[in-house]
Amino acid sequence: MGEKESGDAGEAQRERILRAAALVMAERGFDAARMRDVARGAGVSIGLLQHYFDTRDLLFREAFEWSIGELIARWRKGASAEPDPWRRFELLVRELADDPDLQRRCATWTEFCASAARRPELRDGVRRAHQDWRELVLGIAESGVAAGKFVPVVPTDVAVRSVLAAVDGCDMAVASGSGMGAEGYAAVILATARSVLGVRD
């Protein structure tokens, strides 16, 4: 087991730990996740984990926020150059659905939300993630309305919240092993958004 690294190598090591922690949390749940499993998955010692994260709860909270933040960054990068609002939204949904870690990401999000219902100290992380999602989708919706390409059937904010609720529902379906795959995941979210945003062809 190596020592704590610095600079770019240190950031890569920290990301490897967070990725391993997100996977452990998805598999075991927040309350049952153990640092020894993270250490094994990341190929580091428990002592090294404690250099980066003072407590177990801090490690798993940061793993959750890293998991969501990584996805939102990929969303923004993947669609930032697309001028058409609906096409931009489609690209974002494909980025979600085609994630090779779709099962892990959905399970992590679902588990963290369930844990936040029992543990108030986790709720800020869930609220921040929801706010980031909302701002991203709201920006696309407002662009579509301004361009005359979207005519929402309900107030725009309600339409956006409906889309986010569809994403949450699809995440739960994937996490629970209900049989929903990437194509079904994308189809449900796109159909919901097209309906509530009043997308004009």
Residue spans for each PLM region:
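N-terminal intrinsically disordered/low-complexity leader segments
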Residues: 1-12, 19, 201
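Generic hydrophobic, amphipathic alpha-helix propensity
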Residues: 13-21, 38, 63-67, 71, ...
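Helix-turn-helix
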Residues: 16, 23-58, 62
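Short coil/turn segments at alpha/beta junctions that flank glycine-rich nucleotide-binding fingerprints
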Residues: 27-31, 82, 147
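Residues in soluble alpha-helical coiled-coils and helical-bundle/repeat scaffolds
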Residues: 54-58, 80-83, 97, 101, ...
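Hydrophobic alpha-helical connector segments
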Residues: 62, 73-106, 156-163, 186
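Amphipathic alpha-helical segments used for helix-helix packing
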Residues: 87-88, 101-124
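Hydrophobic/aromatic-rich alpha-helical bundle segments in the mid-to-C-terminal region
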Residues: 122-127, 131, 145-194, 200-201
